[in-house]
Structures are given as structure tokens and as C-alpha cells.
């Protein structure tokens, strides 16, 4: 289930991505594109005296997010169904805006940034986190495994997204007129000496994500079933005792002038 994969991913990456994310007491934070609340729980726990408004266009995802926050006993989050491009908030309503794994799915991420900046007060911060599937390297090397990742990227592009957007964060935020743009790479490396990362990231995050693209890749004619199965089998070798896997996320923080 995709919600389970997202929760596993968020838990595994919590310290790597959020160790330097904290919002002051009383601040209002917009989480745009909260999905099933996987990142929401981490944000709300790390900044218990900040108030979060978490929005998503999907009612189904919001229902799962509300349930997750309720189970966690967190009370500093309010959820609302909303389109990122038509946010139902007044100009300058928020002190901070947080966006994680959202821009990669948008046909026009450049158009999303002005919509987010409209509701951010002058001097407020925008934090954006994205991956970049072109940064995936693994051993044993396999052209068949690499092809499955390329199929994931192509399927995402066919849906209007960009699986390589991490490398573009700096120019995107600069072009949007943001100041003090700082982008930091967050590296994941997994081998058998780091079993938590092998299981939590290589298996349950990355390989699970690639496997989730099977239906789209086959439907689009990007690959046949036999080649897909062979590629996935080879990719899974990176999670064995002699395998290794590395990947880079990008975290950008900037301010509205």
C-alpha cells in the first residue's frame, strides 16, 4: 500500500531530512501537499508549539492523514482540502511554508511557487525537499535494474512530473524571486553494515517505489513484463549482503523578500 510505503519512508528519513527543521513557538506553518500525513507527524512532533495548516487536494489522503495525527495524539495540526494553485488563505497568512515531495509531481512547478509565496509573509521561509532519481547508484551494477528506474522516471514524466527535480531546486527558487536560497544535499548510503538503511530505504522506500511504477511502465509500453521482472530482481541484489545503494535528496531553504 502506498500509504504504508510513505510512512516507512518518512520514518527512515526523519533525521536525515528534518534534523534542522524547527519552527518557533506560535508560528503559523503551511504544509502544502501533505498527502497521507507522513511528513506532518514528524513536523508537528519536532515543533510542538507551532501551528500547522496542512492541505491536500485529495479527500482520501486527508482522511488517512487525520487518522494518523489523531493516533499520534498531536493537536497542533489542522487539515483542509485545497488546491495548491488556489489556496484559500489571505496574502501573508503564514510565517513559514513547507513542501516535501510535491513539486516532482506537478506539470508546472514554476507556477506553484508564486501561489505558495502569496500566502507567505515577507521575510518568511520556504522549505522544499525533493529527491532526484538520477542520483541512484548501486552495486552490483545492472543495466536491467537501471532500466526499471528509467521506466519509473519516464512514467512520471508521462504523468507530467519530473523525477529529476532535486537538481533544479536552486534555479527554480531563484527564478521565483526568493532570497538567501540555500540547497543542501542529503546523502543516503546503505550496505549490510547499516541494516536499518538497507531495510528502511533500499527495500521499503526506493525499490518499493520502483515496483509501484510497474503498471504504468507496462501500460505505456516502456518495457515488457519479463524485462521488468529481471530488472527488479537485479535491483533487489543491492539489498543483499554484498550489495550497496546510495541516493541523494535535496533540501532548499529560502526567504521571501
Residue ranges and their predicted role:
Residues 127-195, 204:
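Conserved catalytic/acceptor-binding region of the Class I
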Residues 182-243:
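C-terminal helical/coil "lid" or tail adjacent to the Rossmann-like core of SAM-dependent
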Residues 110-125:
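A short glycine-rich, Lys/Arg-flanked "PGG" loop and its adjoining helix->strand segment in the class I
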Residues 30, 36-86:
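Class I SAM-dependent methyltransferase SAM/SAH-binding core
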Residues 8-27, 42:
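Conserved alpha-helix/loop element of class I SAM-dependent methyltransferases that forms part
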Residues 176-179, 249-257:
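Core SAM-dependent methyltransferase catalytic element
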Residues 85-96:
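A short acidic, Gly/Pro-enriched loop at the edge of an enzyme's catalytic core
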Residues 95-108:
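A short SAM/SAH-binding and catalytic strip from SAM-dependent methyltransferases
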